[in-house]
Amino acid sequence: VYAPDGPDLQQHLSRINLYNTRATDPASWNEIVYKGDDFFEKMLSEKPGNVVVLSGNNRKKAEYITRSVEAGLNVLADKPMIIVPEDFATLEAAFNKAGENGVLLYDIMTERFEITTILQKLLSQEESVFGKLEAGSEKDPAVTKVSVNHFSKLVSGVPLQRTAWFFDVDQQGE
């Protein structure tokens, strides 16, 4: 784990400890942690593996994705990958670079694998159920899907505490 010191890191490590110490089927994760403001540069210089998981504060995510792909790392990025339209071209270039470098750049939005999402997709493709899809446009899409980050939610049965940056659209996104 490479991260700045603070409540996000502590919350993550506490959650890992809960998994490691639960009564039923405990995990045995051994977290090796580097804390510091230079966490990203340290991770790139040490390159302890070939996959990086990017989650947390989204302000610099497009940069972190790009730099990771350029370093030859496979990237699993939590949503959203970008929070401002200006970063779309950067993200698009990162996907192209990932292809050139033979690495994976993947959005790990777990919701896409939930049965309700899979059923929605299947039903939308069944004309006898859904009907014919109307023509849409960028300003007026035919179909929209909204994913909500709830202020209050449970993670593994424990209330998730949101850190201050979560409420800042310049860091979390809208």
Predicted feature locations:
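N-terminal glycine-/serine-/threonine-rich beta1-alpha1-beta2 phosphate-ribose binding loop
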Residues: 1-73, 86-102
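A cross-family glycoside hydrolase active-site/sugar-binding cleft signature
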Residues: 55, 78, 106-108
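Short helix/strand-capping hinge loops at secondary-structure junctions
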Residues: 72, 78-80
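A contiguous active-site-proximal alpha/beta segment in oxidoreductase catalytic domains
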Residues: 82-170
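Substrate-binding/catalytic subdomain of NAD(P)-dependent oxidoreductase enzymes
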Residues: 173-174
